[in-house]
Amino acid sequence: MLGGDTEWRVIQEIMNKTSNDDYLKWDLMEAPHHCSYKFFADDREDDPNQASLDFLDKSEDGAFVVSSSKIVKKNSDNPPCQKAKNRYTDRIGKSNFFCTGGEKVDDAENPIVFDIEDGEVALHEDEKKEKESRAAAIASKDPKPHFYG
């Protein structure tokens, strides 16, 4: 599911017009608008639209969400929005949520690679190893300030 800048109204319309639930199932989703809260409501303080929550419930077991954003932090940014990330991870789990602007190790890029085979989506085996390796490397480094723009 490629969401682009999809907001909750679009998802509501899709949910209302789609009569075959099989067409709504997904296992890999790009978090719309860089993980802003607009997928759920107009304002981050608003309750989420039920259609957006229902759409998340259409995810297959083991589904992934990828945000084309910097790492989501607990702050007032929107996008990316911590509250939106929490909505996604409540459904798919924290380990299946990724940001393309993730931590770098020794200034190396951090690509996110999936294998799609026979209708199944899985994190690429080398990517799993790299993720574990990066996490260990980041944990072992001295804390340094990070600047985001």
Model regions: which residues?
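Active-site-proximal loop/helix segments of hydrolase catalytic cores
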Residues: 1-61, 65-68, 75-76
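C-terminal regulatory/interaction regions
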Residues: 45-47, 63-64, 68-149
